[in-house]
Amino acid sequence: MIAPGPRATDHDTDVLVVGAGPVGLTLANILGLQGIRTVVVEERDTLIDYPRGVGLDDEALRTFQSIGLVERVLPHTVPNQILRFMDAKRRVLAEMAPPDARFGWPKRNGFVQPLVDAELLAGLDRFAHVQVRWGSPMTGCREDADGVNVELGADGGNVGDGGGDGHPAGLRARYVVGCDGGRSMTRRVMGVSFDGTTSSTRWLVVDIANDPLGHPNSEVGADPERPYASISIAHGIRRFEFMIHADESDEQAEDPEFLTRMLARMVPHPDRVDVIRRRVYTHHSRIAGEFRRGRLLLAGDAAHLMPVWQGQGYNSGIRDAANLGWKLAAVVSGRAGDKLLDTYDMERRKHARAMIDLSTMVGRVISPTNRRVAGARDLLVRSASIVPTLKRYVLEMRFKPMPRYEHGAVVHANPGRADSPVGTLFIQPRVDTRDQQDVLLDDVLGPWFAVLCWNNNPRKILGETAFANWKALGARFFALRPATQLRWTGHDDPDVVVVGDRRGDLKSWFDIHAESVLFLRPDRCIAGACIAQRAPDLSAALFDALTLTPRGGDPQSGTGSVLYVAQPAPESSGAVAGPA
């Protein structure tokens, strides 16, 4: 590992992340891989050791792959988990079992959050320039022209000024990212609104070890008598959720006898379960008025809250980290202008709002306690399932909003064209190179920008000037070919990696798109796409739109183009054990 060189700066760190939850830890890993000095401050003394989120999607696993930790995360997951919606008689109303893995991973995965979070924390041990400070709540901050002075409570983890004697410590950063949850102090300091609604409906949530059911899947019971959920997590843990009626108090719901009555509907011996924890929850549908104000930004629950019904709260936060991480790295390292950070809100807000709306709508469909309303819903759902296209729409989760950026760090050559791939995630099939066989595409592309050409040499298509600019930025270049042409050396270029289309997935993608040249961002979103002859013009437009600089970084103000190679994470002294 190459350490960052000395820099002329009065900043204690480049980025200060408030909150050591999954979003903050993922963001810190992304920044760590890019060589960005990062400090994570957390008011708790350690990670939360009980499950909260219960579902990972394919995009989250792809992000964990990008930070070199997916192999450590996978042992704590249940891949290809089926979710069934049941009526009052426990007959299947609908089923979600999406079969495709276009982004390289299953779309639905159960997981044990404390153990996955512990792997994210352990991943930071790879980076000498990333630190985590426990017992260090942010109590305030003051922004000026080139940085933010942050006040930390307690001893501030002995960072910066003060500390060690009970007095507040200070820390100066170039940017601050609040990943500090729904009650975010960062959001309050920013003076940003958090508009939306809080449901009046309460739910008893209980996690149980030694799963009394034992099957690998999950179900949601749309029972008007009492809606419920039963979710297989992993490692023998099952979550049950039961709606609490208006005439039942929180104290009643937390009584062990109440839980026994609820579980009696599900298991034969409800008094013989190993409860990890039980809590009463309400669901929130809220979004911050701004995700960025000056040098302060918000991510995860600090930026948006949504009901649990699509399992997208955790995953939406990971999307935030993936979108914001590379942009912060580019700006801090001198490879892009500060305006690039404006595209974070521009891109993430619309999709987060769509996820909130979908989750809220699903909750309303599941939760009616009026039998006539529930009966009408059941009839409608069953009628829809008779139509094959509608059944596939639900089964394959086609209703899930996918990120598609119309504005932001993208260039649309033909704005408004419905079939344009620009602003969407590129697929991740398994491919071959001359050195590796049967590997996921992202593992070949690396962690930064990538220029892909089907059936052409990127240098010849871009021209020497554009090629040199992307190379100076740290981008990599790839010639995509049918597998039959992998070993042909006629157009070899020392700066271009030849990729063989192992199963024909890449050709199938290009079969339905006119574009043959793709500019991929580090988060694997397609920043621009065009036919070969337009590549030089699109390249120039992208440098302008993303405020990129071809010099590849200023060593006085950033880390340049130094990247850290992801190594296996050693055991971390900060990691916590999950429930048995």
Swiss-Prot record:
Signal peptide annotation: none
Highest taxon above the source species: Bacteria
Entry keyword annotation includes Phosphoprotein: no
UniProt xrefs under InterPro entries: 3-HPP/3HCI_hydroxylase, FAD-bd, FAD/NAD-bd_sf, PheA/TfdB_FAD_monoxygenase
Record Pfam families: FAD_binding_3
Database matches in Gene3D superfamilies: 3.30.70.2450, FAD/NAD(P)-binding domain
UniProt entry tagged with the keyword Cell membrane: no
Cofactor annotation: FAD
Pathway(s) this gene product operates in, as recorded in its UniProt entry: Aromatic compound metabolism; 3-phenylpropanoate degradation
Gene Ontology biological-process entries: 3-(3-hydroxy)phenylpropionate catabolic process; 3-phenylpropionate catabolic process
Protein's UniProt name: 3-(3-hydroxy-phenyl)propionate/3-hydroxycinnamic acid hydroxylase
Species annotation: Mycobacterium avium (strain 104)
UniProt lineage: Bacteria, Bacillati, Actinomycetota, Actinomycetes, Mycobacteriales
Gene: mhpA
